[in-house]
């Protein structure tokens, strides 16, 4: 923490511009990579018209959206309608100020860390900024004056509230083991072993929560095309729609960078590259960090291409009935092991690893259990009393048994 606060103004400005350029380039490449990967998985070429093999397609789409006519629907709250995309974008970019890209380097004779700033509670600050971004979504849905955007905004609010609880609990074990909430110090604490191995349940819970937090498939319920047209941004077009899309991909990059920081050693080189003496010095760590971020972005693309969208009740059941209870149990286990470590217990590392494997295996077994009971529902249909089944049938209200029989007979 003592290395921050001593940079000259031009160095801080240069780092801020570098982070902005990094995020913009990452978004452009991520959109193209996602479309190419989806095309490959669906046995089609993907974008291949603009530039060599479609390499400039994302840039062309951005220019197209910026130059399109801005259509404003009638009967809206104009101020909130126009401010909502800005509220979504600003927190997404701001959160990256606390992400460490690398160690101290020399820039024109000045020693400076590859990080804009840090705080004793930096991770909590990032968590708060991610929560602020949902205000732009819900305000955009409410200000549009239409039913589908409003439903999408309400869904997004419930989604973020539900999964931020599980995400915060996954952070708690990291804080316990590292003894700090500073991102740079958490990276320093993983110099030996990454927390993805020591705190496996926290990593799995965070991995699921970060997909739900960013409204991505299979948790893209706020913009479910088959139910809500386009969700909260149905009434947005031109540059305002592009800002919502930009915020989504920047948020994906932010949570991916946070996953690399908290669980994958941040900018530390992976094995066996860490055996090289210069792997964690100079500008090399920037390459390792970027590779880790892109690894998590690939998980996003892979999930979108392979998994169907969950129903809303299944999604909420996953968060409240599985992730949060398992997180609470795991926090207590990690706290006990941390207490034993403080009292001089020598075998705390193998004990923690064994506990991680046990809790993670239990969570996987619980994940294999269906979130709804299709067998019970099928037997209820055969008996003709589906309406009296205790299983919820969201979003369609259950029919009365008599009405079901009449419809079957008619």
Swiss-Prot record:
Cellular component GO terms, alphabetical: plasma membrane
Record's subcellular location: Cell membrane
EC number(s) on file: 7.1.1.-
InterPro entries to which the protein is assigned, alphabetical: NADH_UbQ_OxRdtase_su1/FPO, NADH_UbQ_OxRdtase_su1_CS
Recorded catalytic activity of this chain's protein: a quinone + NADH + 5 H(+)(in) = a quinol + NAD(+) + 4 H(+)(out)
Gene Ontology biological-process entries: aerobic respiration
Keyword annotations: Cell membrane, Membrane, NAD, Quinone, Translocase, Transmembrane, Transmembrane helix
Intrachain disulfide bonds: none
Enzyme class at the top of the EC tree: translocase
Segments crossing the lipid bilayer: 11-31, 79-99, 119-139, 160-180, 192-212, 257-277, 283-303, 317-337, 347-367
Any one GO molecular-function label of the UniProt entry: oxidoreductase activity, acting on NAD(P)H, quinone or similar compound as acceptor
Membrane topology: Multi-pass membrane protein
Chain spans, region Disordered: 376-410
HAMAP family assigned: NDH1_NuoH
Self-association and partners: NDH-1 is composed of 14 different subunits. Subunits NuoA, H, J, K, L, M, N constitute the membrane sector of the complex.
Family the UniProt entry places it in: Belongs to the complex I subunit 1 family.
Annotated NCBIfam families: PRK06076.1-2, PRK06076.1-4
Protein purpose: NDH-1 shuttles electrons from NADH, via FMN and iron-sulfur (Fe-S) centers, to quinones in the respiratory chain. The immediate electron acceptor for the enzyme in this species is believed to be menaquinone. Couples the redox reaction to proton translocation (for every two electrons transferred, four hydrogen ions are translocated across the cytoplasmic membrane), and thus conserves the redox energy in a proton gradient. This subunit may bind ubiquinone.
Record-given protein name: NADH-quinone oxidoreductase subunit H
Taxonomic classification: Bacteria, Bacillati, Actinomycetota, Actinomycetes, Mycobacteriales
């Amino acid at each position: 923490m003592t290395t921050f606060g001593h940079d000259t103004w031009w160095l801080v400005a240069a780092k801020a511009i570098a982070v902005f350029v990094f995020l913009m380039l990452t978004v452009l490449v991520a959109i193209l990579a996602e479309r190419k990967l989806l095309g490959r998985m669906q046995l089609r070429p993907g974008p291949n018209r603009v530039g060599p093999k479609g390499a400039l397609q994302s840039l062309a789409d951005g220019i197209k959206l910026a130059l399109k006519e801005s259509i404003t629907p009638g009967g809206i709250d104009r101020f909130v309608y126009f401010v909502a995309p800005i509220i979504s974008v600003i927190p997404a970019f701001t959160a990256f100020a606390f992400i460490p890209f690398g160690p101290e380097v020399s820039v024109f004779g000045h020693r400076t860390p590859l990080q804009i700033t840090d705080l004793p509670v930096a991770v909590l600050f990032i968590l708060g900024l991610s929560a602020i971004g949902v205000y732009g979504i819900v305000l955009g849905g409410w200000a549009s004056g239409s039913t589908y955007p409003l439903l999408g905004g309400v869904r997004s609010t419930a989604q973020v509230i539900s999964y931020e609880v599980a995400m915060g609990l996954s952070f708690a074990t990291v804080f316990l083991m590292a003894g700090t909430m500073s991102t740079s110090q958490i990276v320093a604490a993983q110099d030996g072993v990454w927390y993805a191995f020591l705190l496996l349940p926290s990593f799995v819970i965070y991995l699921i929560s970060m997909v739900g937090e960013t409204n991505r498939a299979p948790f893209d319920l706020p913009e479910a095309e088959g139910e809500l047209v386009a969700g909260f941004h149905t009434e947005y077009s031109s540059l305002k729609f592009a800002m919502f899309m930009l915020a989504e991909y920047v948020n994906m990059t932010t949570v991916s960078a946070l996953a690399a920081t908290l669980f994958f050693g941040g900018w530390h080189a992976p094995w066996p590259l860490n055996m090289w003496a210069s792997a964690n010095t100079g500008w090399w760590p920037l390459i390792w960090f970027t590779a880790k971020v892109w690894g998590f972005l690939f998980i996003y693309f892979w999930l979108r291409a392979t998994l169907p969208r969950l129903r809303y009740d299944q999604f909420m059941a996953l968060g409240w009935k599985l992730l949060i209870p398992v997180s609470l149990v795991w926090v207590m286990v990690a706290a006990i092991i941390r207490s034993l470590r403080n009292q001089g217990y020598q075998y705390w590392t193998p004990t923690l690893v064994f506990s991680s494997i046990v809790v993670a295996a239990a969570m996987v077994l619980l994940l294999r259990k269906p979130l709804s009971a299709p067998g019970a529902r099928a037997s209820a249909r055969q008996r003709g009393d589906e309406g009296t089944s205790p299983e919820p049938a969201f979003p369609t209200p259950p029919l009365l048994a008599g009405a079901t029989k009449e419809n079957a007979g008619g």
